[in-house]
Amino acid sequence: MLRWLTLLSCILLTALHGNIVEDVGAAQQASYPPPPPPFPFNVIVILPKRESTYDNFGMTLQKAMPVIDIAVQEVIKAKKLPPGWINLTYWDSRLYEDILLAERHATVGVIQAYCEHRLDAILGFADNYGLATVTKVTAGLNGGIPILTTSGMPSLLNSKKEYPFLTRMQGSYRLLADSMYQLIAYHDEDSVSKSNSSLNYLNLIFFYHDKRRAVNRVIAQDESQETGATSSHCYFSLYAIKRYFTEKSKTFKREWALNTPQFPFDEDLVIERETFKQWLREISLQSNVIILCASPDTVREIMLAAHDLGMATSGEYVFINIDVSTGSHAEQPWIRANDTNNEENEKAKEAYRALKTISLRRSDLDEYKNFELRVKERADQKYNYTNITGKDYEMNNFISAFYDAVLLYAIALNETIQSGLDPRNGHNITSRMWGRTFVGITGNVSIDHNGDRYSDYSLLDLDPVQNRFVEVAYYSGASNQLKTVGQLHWVGGKPPTDLPICGYDKSKCPGYPLHVYLLMGSFLLILVLVGLFIFFWRRYKLEQELAAMSWKIRWEELDGEESQKKNEKKKAKKRKNHNDYLPESDPLLRSTSRSSVNSDKFDEDSLIPIRFRLRSSSSGTTRKISAMIDRKLSIFTRKKSTPPSESQKNGGLTPNSLQKAENGDCSPINEVQFRLPLNDRRVSSPSSEATRKKNSNEEDPENGAKKSLSLKNRKLSFGMVSFKSGSGGSVETIAQNNTQIYTKTAIFKGVVVAIKKLNIDPKKYPRLDLSRAQLMELKKMKDLQHDHITRFTGACIDFPHYCVVTEYCPKGSLEDILENEKIELDKLMKYSLLHDLVKGLFFLHNSEIRSHGRLKSSNCVVDSRFVLKVTDFGLHRLHCLEEINLEEIGEHAYYKKMLWTAPELLRDSNAPPMGTQKGDIYSFAIILHEMMFRKGVFALENEDLSPNEIVQRVRKPVSEDQEPLRPWVSETGEGEGDDALNDTLLSLMVACWSEDPHERPEVSSVRKAVRSLNRDNETSNLVDNLLKRMEQYANNLEGLVEERTQEYLAEKKKVEELLHQLLPPAIADTLIAGRAVQAESYDCVTIYFSDIVGFTSLSSQSTPMQVVTLLNDLYLAFDGVVDNFKVYKVETIGDAYMVVSGLPERRDDHANQIAQMSLSLLHKVKNFVIRHRPHEQLKLRIGMHSGSVVAGVVGSKMPRYCLFGDTVNTSSRMESNGLPLKIHVSQQTYDILMQEAGFKLELRGSVEMKGKGMQTTYWLRGYKDVEIPDFGEEFA
């Protein structure tokens, strides 16, 4: 019957030439068209051309067309359909403001399009009435017309018997009702479906906009004028909530059986704020849980009225706003830019604290954000949206859903054609759209078997810290679960009760006689006065404490390095007579390591002070510690002892040398391994002072330059040495170009404290005028006391010495301990240190500090009792004054500090300076990985990334199918030392560095997990805990000392070998022993002098590098010859070469050795080739003389072994008066040589020498079968 009526309608409409419907996208055809070809498929988009009061979701053609355009382009680009297969026609569904006329207009237009074969699918509809009518009509056309709508959410459209081809891209209000039910609904044993709600509200009232049922509705005299009064979307949404609640809960069904608490109104009429106040007074007598549904402007007026009545600030009322159209992007809905009264915005903000909003969940994918930008650009460029409407384009979920609708239709159409079925049959298309999931612009889109999308809803709440509405929970339509992702903030600190104690009308509270009220009033007045007195007294005391600034430390009170240097000089004078002390003025001390082992072996006497120091460092815990240490150290006494004299000769330890450290700050083991000046905690490599300065860029402190120590040299055993830097630094270890500097220390009131310099520019802040907030921050820091955080001693704000003073922990930081490969940490020690860290972090999170913000392994320090403490926390307002100089710090060090920072804080340009507790949990996970694997911070398996590259990759957001960059974890779960990691600890680490901060555990959960692992190792008895830690520490003592001793011996041997090359071995050994070298006279020695003839001319014709190369090659060759004879090379000066025989080892054949050496040198010169002048013969001139000399060491810096006497001068004259490539011999040397057979000498004759007169000299021609080489006739 319906088909016959449709055919009749087609005939009538054709006769009328189709002039009823206005076609926005294409011209109307005047004649009836022929049957359609297979392609294209005609899709009609039916939406209002302009906004209307009936359109609550902002759905217009101007907004939808750019979205549909992009969707069609993406379908063609993805090859789901070829170009030209879809023909879009846009209709204005609102030619008439009257909704009933608009409904008829749309229905007639659809029938006409069908009759003209221009209808294959329908997309759109902003009102439910027109949608319902058209859906019913098109169900009977041919095989049905598929309709896809982004609205149509009322439960009345759920019936697929009446609406068999309707697909709803936003689902139905039933999912909204389910989310409300799980959030607030009261549930008891009679409930059909249990709710997980913690609010458990039963007394609800609906306060919403609806023209048809409004209490302020204007009754028209003519009933025909009321046809436009239709039900609003608020009514449909609240109707769905009522229906769902009564289905799921028998209690609600019983309570709402007769009447549903509601208060509808017409917001299109002018409503004064006083009217809203009157309505809210009436509502407050019925319920304190008010469910709102109206436009954003109306909701703001209602909340302002509630604020004026005190309902929004009392904490007794809660407002739940249903706003599905605005979306979850409305972060500050209380602000109105056109509101000239700024106080109204502030008042509205305060009122919105009592408001919770439920809206469709907004996608936060990057693809969706890019899609929004593309749509806005298309709307302005192609459709001139901004100029036509006068406002910026704004996207919402109902508009963006058109993209998913086009994509879904294209997928179903493609599959229908591929299956060989009729693509114009509505059943074939609809059956392929329902019950499927596909990837849309908002992510995964799921359509149920009823044609409704599984929509997600967000619960938004005003975050007082971020000053905006944020998502605290969301409802997943696919899983029908409400998931919490944040914390609700309630006025008054807790949610209001469902029913006030006295009832809404105060009828449940009985009255009392007048005298009772007087007594109660008097009592309350006294309490108020007492309270005011206490308040003002405490405030007065607080102000006094703030003004006193007990934390303030004057720079003069810090006994720093200058004072320590003066004391050091005084103490050095007293120690000069000790045999075991090497004065710093001794040049040999500067040429060797500044940190050296004092003896090769240890004797019983040297261990007495060590035991004493170890006992005294335990603060007198019990005799058990001393006994245990004695057992561990007694192994050294079983070794062969060195006699005291030998020990002193080698710079060994004595009780006196150990006793001098009793007043210092170094640990006892420091005295076993290293000789350090008192109060100096610096550590250097075993290289010479000059080499150390060159390699580490360190300069003399007297010159005011900075110092740095290499990372390699910094690594020492756990608890072995205390450290100190002359250039300051921070409490944490500061990395600068592969160097490490520990914190500066000072003496404050007799106690060693750590100094952290604040990088505050003195020029910018010549005076620190602290605000009240900063003073409060410093006071809170001063009041903090806990076993596992460093004690805040105070701060210095004297210009320009801005610094923070804290407790000094001499064992170094956790980072240094982990980086030192020599330190073996067993599982119990790791758990113990980890437990200390968690306890310190737990205290901070529950204190007024709230969070650390800069947690890293270098901010975890270990004190002398092996207790780990958290440091460098708090004082965030003071740190805000600091400036970061990237050039001074270095890029590597700057980004390395960020490796512990949580990804959400890296992405947030306005991250809170104090950090977050969830950020601290992430930092804890990175530290935990460092401790378990000991591969360094953020160790990766097969990637060699710089800290900058790691930070950038961690900062970059990741999608759900991507794995975020995290430190490498072995698949077998093996940690450092091939120990299998505890599964609980591994799971805890992975959970703590989760990408989503909401998925990270609280610190209380972390503490509980770590405490369960360390239960056997940690007791409540401090002494027992200390005993265990001391025993663990002492277990490695023997191996560490032995290993360091061997390292020392190897370094000592290298230094001695180098020194023996600079000085005669006997002289060097005398200086090493600390004894002065006495000058010694020698009756007869032979001295050799030589130089290069024409060297000055040769140098002027050569480059400096060529000259250096020449001399180096020549002297290396000479040194090889000299080593074959019993001679001593004295020195080389330029081209001059001086050798002596007969000293320091006395021998009679000194002239013989020098003569043979001279002949060998001439033979070496014969074959010597000058690199840059290979064809030129090097001309060596040699002179030698015998006589008496005096030899001794001259100078304290760069000591030289020098010869003195007339013999030296005569030898030099013999050389200068000789000839090239000949050996000039004096009369004295001639007399000695002639006593031995074999030497061939030729008389030269008398030669006049400066200062000597005429001297008879000789030429040495050969020795036995060795002759002078033949250099040619020129040199014969």
UniProtKB/Swiss-Prot annotation:
Residues 567-577 have a biased composition (Basic residues). Its EC number is 4.6.1.2. The chain crosses the membrane at residues 516-536. It catalyses: GTP = 3',5'-cyclic GMP + diphosphate. Residues 590-599, 642-660 have a biased composition (Polar residues). PROSITE patterns: GUANYLATE_CYCLASE_1, GUANYLATE_CYCLASE_2, PROTEIN_KINASE_DOM. The keyword Lyase applies. Residues 562-601, 635-709 are annotated as: Disordered. Residues 1017-1063 form a coiled coil. Residues 537-1276 are cytoplasmic. ATP binds at residues 723-731, 756. Residues 1-18 form the signal peptide. Residues 19-515 are extracellular. Keywords: ATP-binding, Cell membrane, Cell projection, cGMP biosynthesis, Chemotaxis, Coiled coil, Glycoprotein, GTP-binding, Lyase, Magnesium, Membrane, Metal-binding, Nucleotide-binding, Receptor, Signal, Transmembrane, Transmembrane helix. Glycans are attached at residues 87, 196, 338, 384, 387, 414, 428, 444. Residues 1086-1215 form the Guanylate cyclase domain. Gene3D superfamilies: 3.40.50.2300, Nucleotide cyclase, Transferase(Phosphotransferase) domain 1. The protein kinase domain is predicted to be catalytically inactive. Belongs to the adenylyl cyclase class-4/guanylyl cyclase family. PANTHER family: ATRIAL NATRIURETIC PEPTIDE RECEPTOR 2 (PTHR11920:SF494), GUANYLYL CYCLASE (PTHR11920). Guanylate cyclase involved in the production of the second messenger cGMP. Regulates olfactory perception in AWC sensory neurons although may not be involved in the primary sensory transduction steps. This is Receptor-type guanylate cyclase gcy-28. It comes from Caenorhabditis elegans. The gene is gcy-28.
